[in-house]
């Protein structure tokens, strides 16, 4: 009998073991769809990005008009650009839901998988930031100026670091050129890290909604979850195309329709919606270095999740107090996102400070305490 090529071929064997014959818990819910959705997002972004890069010019005098030219004169250029810009939003929606799922069900106890995931998030944030600068509109320019300027808060080496990043004494042509190079490079780095992420995941196997070992009860990934994933893809593409075709500028900033002008500062400088929660935390501290540290901590705190887990049960499925706290944290993140989009004035300043304080308190103090309390409750 001839050997099964899918199981014997050196390359196909790897694909088979990760996408076809992969033993999967039978009870994973739709919350487990977001990993594959992120993969599809990445592929879509690389494809649309490549097509956009073919028509883009990374020069301060031409960048804005080259993007306008793509939208006006290139076949379906407007569609490619809208899919790429809104695809970034969907990428972040998926990654935030994916992280939320991991947090709720205790998936962070697979430390290597979790840590590579956090590194992926940081790389994605860097990619989105440098990408937002490329159209060279007002918000692109001032966003780049404000965020890169934060590095100057680092003691001793800060100013040198910023000038080195800018390639001069302000955000200018060298900055745009290197940001384009980075924006082209980073997605491939994300793709590489994704393989590392999956390698670590397949060492342990997937977690499941009950947070218990399911080795005795697994089913093959194909056809069950391939079909389930295709349903997820269809729904996401439906939402993405609807957004890109009906209201492509809904999530963008109108300020970015004005070409970059270093002499005119926009009234409210704010990043894209997916960074607003971190931006609100940055603004809530009146000291520059303190704000930068809080901004970094807001994302890096995810690395601490495995060490702050004090509960005997893995998932929050049967832990009502932790569930309540989790949803308070989610609501808190929505408040931070909203505050980040508002001007720096009363009452938004105090709301932002309270929400930032609550964010860190919940993650660092309340979750471990509630976990330990629930352990005590198991005895009664």
UniProtKB/Swiss-Prot annotation:
Alphabetically ordered keywords of this record: Electron transport, Heme, Iron, Membrane, Metal-binding, Mitochondrion, Mitochondrion inner membrane, Respiratory chain, Transmembrane, Transmembrane helix, Transport, Ubiquinone
Show the GO cellular component annotation of the record.
mitochondrial inner membrane; respiratory chain complex III
| Location relative to the cell | Mitochondrion inner membrane
Q: Which residues bind a ubiquinone?
A: 202
Q: What membrane topology is given?
A: Multi-pass membrane protein
> Cross-referenced PROSITE patterns, in alphabetical order?
CYTB_CTER, CYTB_NTER
Under InterPro entries, the record lists:
Cyt_b/b6_C, Cyt_b/b6_C_sf, Cyt_b/b6_N, Cytb/b6-like_sf, Cytochrome_b, Cytochrome_b_C_euk/bac, Cytochrome_b_N_euk/bac, Di-haem_cyt_TM
Q: Which positions in this protein are listed as binding heme b b562?
A: 84, 183
| Cofactor(s) annotated in UniProt | heme b
Q: Where does heme b b566 bind?
A: 98, 197
Molecular function GO terms recorded: metal ion binding; ubiquinol-cytochrome-c reductase activity
User: What's any GO biological process attached to this entry?
Assistant: mitochondrial electron transport, ubiquinol to cytochrome c
Main localisation: mitochondrion
Q: Which family does it belong to?
A: Belongs to the cytochrome b family.
Assembly and binders: The cytochrome bc1 complex contains 11 subunits: 3 respiratory subunits (MT-CYB, CYC1 and UQCRFS1), 2 core proteins (UQCRC1 and UQCRC2) and 6 low-molecular weight proteins (UQCRH/QCR6, UQCRB/QCR7, UQCRQ/QCR8, UQCR10/QCR9, UQCR11/QCR10 and a cleavage product of UQCRFS1). This cytochrome bc1 complex then forms a dimer.
Give the matching PANTHER family. Answer: CYTOCHROME B (PTHR19271:SF16)
Any extra remark in the record? Answer: Heme 1 (or BL or b562) is low-potential and absorbs at about 562 nm, and heme 2 (or BH or b566) is high-potential and absorbs at about 566 nm.
Q: What is the role of this chain?
A: Component of the ubiquinol-cytochrome c reductase complex (complex III or cytochrome b-c1 complex) that is part of the mitochondrial respiratory chain. The b-c1 complex mediates electron transfer from ubiquinol to cytochrome c. Contributes to the generation of a proton gradient across the mitochondrial membrane that is then used for ATP synthesis.
Q: What is this protein called?
A: Cytochrome b
**Species of origin:** Procellaria westlandica (Westland petrel)
Q: What is the lineage of its organism?
A: Eukaryota, Metazoa, Chordata, Craniata, Vertebrata
